């Protein structure tokens, strides 16, 4: 293997792939369609395994400098308040980072991109969209296009498709994206109001049969802190009305009346999917991140899962670079796809179902189970191993 690894997509999974590959001496070329980084509100939660994977590059230390540490997270009820609080210190024997770290996704991408661009092993093309893919036995060729429509071609040894849920790379290989789309869209309202004095942990999930809410704190651009609140919406609701900041402020006030004291600084609306690619490998074309799997954001798993894909994939490609066979790529497909189906999809779907449970008896039973789990250190650890994504990684490693 002498040609570079090509990477379509300069988001979290793509930049993480590049970062992990250059650390192992493998040259890369990254193609990112956007001419500059996206700064709109996206994911912001990093689980312990992700912090471990990013540690050797120095990114984890920088995340600690710029992010917020959430040592506990909560389940709440809109009427009753706190139901259960889970202390991540129960994972102290399982990880060096027994907490969640919260920092906006675009800041992470910038941290990784800065390190990748500084490497002589990397070339990063911004404003370059991959529009066609061809492959044969010993190489893969991509056609990429600049904003003016000018096209060029480049050969690589392998292509990582990390180009998002609508991945052209995935579509170019006729790989099915199996799953479904939720009927409701999710509204994200970012506010200056501080929920912490009201007893909210930096990450909290509030159950309600009519309108559940997820709240979490991020540093904000000025470091003073912002809170993001996620609400479900009805399919028939008008997009412009949902995004209107005055209406969003009223929605927040219906949830927490005191929030009128804060300012709504951003609103965002997006469709929510639960899908996994039919395969993560087709010859010399590989999938990672949202190109391989998408899920609802409850639990903060999607971004982390893409970085885990990148870490696994880079380790395999580095071995191939040194002359080993490509059998590990088939294992990558088996392991990462299986854990996406069994853990990522199952956990995020369960999270949503828990928050929106309409049956009063079922809701009461779930809340009683949460209280009992949080109060028992052994049960809490077992539950947190799953929600912190440690159990899934351990299970994947057992798949031959």
What would you call each of these model-derived segments?
Residues 3, 148-158:
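Core beta-strand elements of the Rossmann-like FAD/NAD(P) dinucleotide-binding domain
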Residues 9-19, 23, 31, 112, ...:
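Conserved mid-domain beta->alpha element of the FAD-binding
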Residues 22-43:
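Glycine-rich FAD pyrophosphate-binding loop
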Residues 42, 47-115, 344:
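Active-site-adjacent segment of FAD-dependent monooxygenases/related oxidoreductases
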Residues 114, 132, 158, 162-268, ...:
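Conserved FAD-binding catalytic core of PHBH/FMO-like flavoproteins
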Residues 126-140:
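A conserved short coil-to-beta-strand element within the FAD-binding core of flavoproteins
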Residues 316-400:
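C-terminal helical "tail/cap" subdomain of flavin- and related membrane-associated enzymes
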């Amino acid at each position: 293997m002498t040609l570079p690894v090509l990477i379509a997509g300069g988001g979290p999974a793509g930049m993480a792939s590049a970062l992990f590959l250059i650390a192992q001496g493998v040259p890369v070329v990254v193609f990112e369609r956007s001419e500059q980084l996206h700064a709109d509100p996206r994911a912001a939660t990093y689980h312990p395994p992700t912090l471990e994977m990013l540690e050797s590059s120095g990114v984890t230390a920088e995340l600690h400098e710029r992010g917020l540490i959430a040592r506990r997270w909560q389940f709440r009820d809109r009427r009753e308040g706190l139901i259960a609080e889970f202390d991540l210190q129960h994972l102290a024997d399982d990880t060096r980072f027994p907490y969640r770290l919260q920092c906006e996704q675009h800041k992470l991408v910038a941290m990784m991109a800065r390190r990748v661009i500084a490497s002589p092993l990397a070339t990063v093309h911004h404003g370059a969209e991959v529009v066609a893919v061809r492959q044969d036995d010993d190489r893969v060729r991509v056609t990429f296009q600049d904003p003016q429509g000018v096209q060029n071609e480049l050969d690589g040894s392998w292509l990582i498709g990390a180009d998002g849920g609508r991945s052209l790379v995935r579509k170019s290989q006729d790989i099915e994206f199996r799953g479904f789309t939720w009927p409701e869209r999710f509204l994200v309202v970012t506010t200056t109001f501080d929920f912490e004095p009201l007893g909210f942990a930096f990450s909290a999930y509030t159950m309600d049969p009519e309108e559940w809410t997820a709240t979490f704190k991020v540093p904000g651009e000025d470091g003073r802190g912002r809170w993001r609140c996620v609400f479900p919406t009805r399919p028939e609701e008008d997009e412009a009305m949902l995004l209107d900041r005055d209406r969003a402020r009223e929605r927040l006030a219906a949830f927490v009346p005191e929030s009128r004291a804060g300012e709504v600084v951003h609103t965002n609306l997006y469709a929510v999917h639960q899908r996994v690619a039919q395969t993560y490998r087709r010859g010399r074309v590989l999938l990672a991140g949202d190109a391989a799997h998408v899920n609802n954001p409850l639990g903060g798993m999607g971004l982390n899962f893409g970085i885990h894909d990148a870490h696994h994939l880079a380790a395999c490609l580095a071995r191939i670079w040194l002359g080993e066979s490509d059998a590990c790529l088939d294992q990558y497909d088996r392991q990462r796809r299986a854990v996406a189906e069994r853990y990522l999809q199952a956990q995020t779907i369960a999270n949503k179902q828990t928050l929106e449970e309409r049956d009063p008896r079922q809701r009461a039973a779930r809340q009683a189970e949460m209280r009992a789990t949080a109060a028992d250190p052994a049960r809490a650890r077992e539950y947190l191993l799953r929600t912190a994504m440690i159990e899934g990684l351990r299970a994947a490693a057992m798949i031959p």
